[in-house]
Amino acid sequence: MTKYLLICLVVCALIFQGCWHHESAVERGYNEKYIGEYTRKIAFPIGGIGTGMFCIEGTGALSNMSIRHRPNVFNEPTMFAAIHVKGYEYGTRILEGPVPEWKKFGAPNSSRGDGGSWGMPRFKEYSFQSRFPFAEVELADQNVPIDVKLVAWNPFIPTDEDNSSLPVAGFEYEFHNTSNEEVQAVFSYNSMNFMQTPGRGKAYIDAAKNGFILRQTGTENEPFCQGDFMIYTDNPQTVVNHNWFRGGWFDPLSICWDNLEEGRMEENPAGLEG
């Protein structure tokens, strides 16, 4: 069993929200795990008090990215964790459950295919459980010899408003080998620079210990455009690719996924804008 801790450090002003699933309230006991239709509209708020927010959904996806004092329920940036299990034909998966049907026509431009990573394979079985400030997502798939448990948490400490107001969120991933053989796998966390505001300063990916920072500078007239979002892990053997393939349309994401499917760990330095 392997366990990793992924920390999201949001050094910009955010906000927060929540919701998810439906299936006949009679069929589900009070405070039990959410499964099936019950998970469809869950959005559990993550972030420190007064720091802004994003949400972890019932499938494990991230959405409601509300930054720069702007609540935005449709802001679902392309960012995801993934696993590649070596030697398995279908062993590469985003660490989320299937995308809910309602989303495919529910967000701006979604009918035109602007669904970010929606077309990538995900785990077929999943459940969600919340015990504030913790949210827990469990994932399983018969094609992948690894079960996954994700625990996401807020920096909420009763009577300690200072530490409870830190702009951080914690994501702990636990992997369990369900086969009778040794398994080799590559875990990755991937994100486009959703901090970017075109035409307002410069956007780039900066280096951080065991991770990376999504940066956007401000301008003299619009200094409020400046913002930073750091993603890092406590694993000292982390390899970071700061620059995806530069191309048009969906080329960057497609090449990123090709690398994930091949278990390729590219290490590119920071420095390029965009």
Give residue spans per PLM region.
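Beta-strand-rich N-terminal accessory domains
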Residues: 22-99
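Short, solvent-exposed loop/turn and secondary-structure capping segments
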Residues: 54-58, 64-68, 94-96, 107, ...
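Extended, loop-rich substrate-binding clefts of extracytoplasmic carbohydrate-active enzymes
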Residues: 103-168, 245-274
